[in-house]
């Protein structure tokens, strides 16, 4: 379960932002996770909530937005969405490197048939915003 390690990294970053801004507590954290990261949003939220206990992040609202991903052919430039069902294949969850995903799915470009297929978006996890309670300020954005 890589949700735990991602949650730890997110929490460390959020705590660092809160500390630098002199925040008493964190009110909310908005994350964007790509669907190709194969992160489970519910598991990620659970890990964040458990790890946040006893910190200024405890009680914060975790908003998680899913970024859709696409495939792009390196030969002809065609860009397309995968079938949503193909992303539910349990064997995909063994991919540790996102570049393996195109191989596991045995992808071919639907336009030209090339196997030179790359991910185009949906492969990252980012902190979009952090809402803080800072003494003397009205709900600062981090």
From Swiss-Prot:
GO biological process: protein maturation; protein modification process
Molecular functions (GO terms): nickel cation binding; zinc ion binding
Record keywords: Metal-binding, Nickel, Zinc
InterPro entries in the record: Hydgase_Ni_incorp_HypA/HybF_CS, HypA/HybF
Coiled-coil portions: none
Residues noted as binding Ni(2+) in the record, renumbered to the chain: 2
PANTHER family (UniProt xref): HYDROGENASE MATURATION FACTOR HYPA
Record's protein name: Hydrogenase maturation factor HypA
Species this protein is from: Methanopyrus kandleri (strain AV19 / DSM 6324 / JCM 9639 / NBRC 100938)
UniProt lineage: Archaea, Methanobacteriati, Methanobacteriota, Methanomada group, Methanopyri
GN (gene name): hypA
